[in-house]
């Protein structure tokens, strides 16, 4: 019997439309990771060592298919120029370390804010996406808002660059013109397919066993 495909291989298969029909579970859970590490949030989010260790411990605890190396709300805590902030720099370095230490065990996913939330707009998003791809992420997720009112050439450029790295680019809302990522509520999980995130960034006090159940359910 063939061995099950690794999370990295499952993500890569999405590029060819050859997904296995099961969910690739990626919880938004940095605050929980900080609690697992027993770290203060402000230090955790700006320290690449704490961030990498916390996300690795989170993966050990809940066995997800993917780890979100950055989240929009966390990146924006440092301002709208996300690559120059302490949070952005910490996330990039943590990505490099996780890439080296975790191999194919989990897919590394960069969840980035939509262009309307960034000082440099679409150009800022393009540069951020390129930086995280160079650091080693396996997928990009753009979590925009209603102000992101249409697809652009730059988003197509970003998706093409990501494809060169064998990384899919997905996002919400649909107006971004990207393949959709599924957002599943933590308190109402259901089997899903493709890349699947918790609907929101989970609070620090989230129960680890309940999150493990969420992962198992959306994976199907």
Model-flagged regions — what are they?
Residues 53, 76-135:
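Active-site-proximal, glycine-rich beta->alpha crossover segments in alpha/beta enzymes
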Residues 66-87, 136-152:
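Glycine-rich, proline-tolerant flexible connector loops at the mouths of alpha/beta enzymes
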Residues 90-96, 148-156:
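Active-site-adjacent beta->alpha loops and helix N-cap segments on the catalytic face
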Residues 27-29, 71, 110-114, 144, ...:
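A cross-domain feature marking catalytic cores of carbohydrate-active enzymes
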Residues 120-142, 147, 155-160, 164:
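Alpha/beta enzyme core
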